[in-house]
A protein has these predicted regions:
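Gly/Pro/Ser/Thr-rich low-complexity, intrinsically disordered segments predominantly at protein N-termini
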Residues: 1-191
Length: 191
């Protein structure tokens, strides 16, 4: 089993510029940086996880293409959260007016903004506690709606800003609720 590697030796010693250089020089590797300065090296997902992630991204992208309410990002996109962590959700979405407030320079880097919506897809390489902690961090940083999807268990944890986490089993679809009107994500290809 390939696992995510946390490199604690760099805690509080890597600058934003160094992190950006590291990512640019290692485009085939996905990195995140915790708010404590811990560098996380993430292994690529397997083909099935990649397919599932692509399906989720495609459904969000298609809905957004029709509604034009925001901007959709895939898992290669990094954001600098308000707590200074640099995170890359599997799928994310930002309300257009919030994205438009950022400068071109900010948009070209790890944009200093928490997405309004995130999806994390639990892959065999992930530690559940790490991904749940990341979802809690997203909430604390202002993410309004988040889905943690466990394909093997046909389970979804829904994280809503200011509310308790809701756990749902055997769903056929998920709703974007008030945040993303008329969004319905079909989970049958994921489960």
């Amino acid at each position: 089993v390939i696992e995510t590697i946390n490199i604690k030796a760099l805690a509080n010693s890597i600058t934003d510029e160094q992190f950006e250089q590291l990512c640019a020089q290692n485009r085939d590797t996905k990195f995140e940086l915790t708010s404590q300065g811990e560098l996380i090296v993430m292994s690529p997902t397997g083909s099935e996880s990649g397919r599932q992630n692509g399906d989720l991204f495609g459904q969000i992208w298609y809905w957004n293409r029709q509604t034009q309410l925001g901007i959709v990002f895939d898992s290669s996109t990094g954001f600098t959260l308000p707590n200074d962590a640099k995170r890359s959700p599997d799928v994310s979405w930002i309300i257009k007016s919030r994205w438009d407030e950022l400068s071109i320079k900010q948009k070209r880097k790890f944009a200093p903004i928490a997405p309004d919506f995130v999806i994390e897809l639990l892959s065999p390489n992930d530690r559940l506690s790490d991904v749940q902690s990341k979802m809690t961090e997203y909430q604390a940083c202002g993410v309004k709606l988040g889905w943690l999807i466990y394909p093997d268990e046909k389970r979804v944890e829904i994280y809503r800003l200011g509310k308790e986490t809701e756990v749902l089993l055997e769903l056929k679809n998920l709703s974007g609720e008030d945040l993303m009107p008329k969004l319905t994500v079909d989970l049958q290809e994921i489960f």
